[in-house]
Amino acid sequence: MRKERCRIGVVAPASRMAPEVAERVPAVARSLYPDRTPEIVFHPQCLAAHGHFAGDDETRAQAFLDIANDESYDAVWFARGGYGSCRVVEAVMCKLTEPSRRKAYIGYSDAGVLLAALYRSGFETVAHGPVAQDILRDGGDAAVGRALAWMVDRSPEALEPTVSRLKLTAAFNMTVLSQLLGTPLQPDLDGHVLMLEEVGEAMYRIDRSLFHITSNAEIRRVAGVMLGRCSGIIPNEPDFGMNEEEIARYWCQRSGIPWLGRADIGHDTNNKIVPFGTSHERC
C-alpha cells in the first residue's frame, strides 16, 4: 500500500557529515513535496567525530542498525562517502533484522561496501546514487532531488538512462569494488551490466584497478562494463599515454568482457541512480 509520507533515515558509516546538510536537505524536500514532504531524520551520529570517522566503529555500526532495523523507516540514506564502511560492515550485517529487508538503501563511493554486502545478502532495493552531502556541491539541489525522487516514488526519471532497457545492473566506484573482490563481501554480479566511476586517481591507478577487476573470474561473468565519469584525475608523470576510456576498453578486450560504452554516473551532482539488480517499484 502506498504511504502518504516517506520516512528516511540518514546515517554516516564512514566520514563525518557537515552540519549544514541537516538544514539544507529538508528544505529541498519541502520545496519538492509540499503536500507530502518526506520526513528526513539525521541520526545524531552523522555529526560525531572520532579522528577520520563519524564516531568510532561501534558508534557508526550501531547508528546504521538503529535506522535499518527500525520498521518506521522506509529508506536508509548515506550521509556521505569518505572512508570507513569496511570497518563496520561485518558487525552490521550479522545484526540486521527483518525490517531492514523492507527498506531502500542509497549511496555511492565508500557506501559501496555496505551496498555490496546488502545486495549479496539478498536485499532487493539497493542503489548507487547521490548522498545527502551532495547538497553542498554545485548543482547539489538537483542531486538531492534525484535521490528523493527515487526513495519516495522510484521515479524512472532519476535513473541512469540505460537502466530501463537493461535486465540487471550494478554500479561502483572502481577502487571500492577492486578492494572488495576476493573478500566475503564480493557480490554476485553474474549477468549484470557493471557501471564503474572514479575520482582523484592517476591514470596508472585506474589501469591497476581495472586490471584487478577484470581479472576476477566472477567479474568475467558480467554482461558487460560501462564507464562513468573519472574526475579529478591526478597528473601522471610521465603521461600515461591512454585516457580512462582507452584503459577500460583495453582491459575489457583482454578479459573478454563486453565493452558497452559510457554511463551517466560519477563523483558529481550529475550522478544518476543505478539500482542493483532490477529497478523496483516504489514500496
Which positions does each model-derived feature cover?
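Conserved anion/nucleotide-ligand pocket segment
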Residues: 123-182
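Short, acidic/small-residue loops that bind anionic groups at enzyme active sites
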Residues: 94-117, 125-131, 254, 258-260
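Short Gly/Thr/Asp-enriched flexible loops that form oxyanion-binding sites at enzyme active sites
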Residues: 81-100, 119
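Charged helix-capping and loop-helix junction motifs
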Residues: 25, 56-61, 208-213, 239-247
